[in-house]
Amino acid sequence: MSSGKVKAGELWNKSKDDLTKQLAELKTELGQLRIQKVASSGSKLNRIHDIRKSIARVLTVINAKQRAQLRLFYKNKKYAPLDLRAKQTRAIRRRLSPDEKSRVLEKTKKRTVHFPQRKFAIKA
């Protein structure tokens, strides 16, 4: 794949096999360019930069697709891996759950039943 930069938009439509093949091609090309750089003058330094960025684009697409598949897999499961859960602050993670908030002690329940809030009528 010695033609220009890789466009990320084109990568999304490719299958996993195509992406891994392209990644292997880019890595071999990068290796060849590094050998050329050592052997002769550094005329292809810009090309090395482009190839490295292209490798990063391909890896980004592969990882994003993989994470999307994992999200689908864990969608209706009780537990999901920490990195797939919605990001929350530490304080929010330590908050009481709605179930824990709604719990009332037996003694408190009895008090509210036996001694309800008094209603006063104001004489006008």
UniProtKB/Swiss-Prot annotation:
GO terms for cellular component: cytosolic large ribosomal subunit. Belongs to the universal ribosomal protein uL29 family. CDD domains: Ribosomal_L29_HIP. InterPro entries: Ribosomal_uL29, Ribosomal_uL29_euk, Ribosomal_uL29_sf. The keyword tRNA-binding does not apply. GO terms for molecular function: mRNA binding; structural constituent of ribosome. This is Large ribosomal subunit protein uL29. Keywords: Ribonucleoprotein, Ribosomal protein.
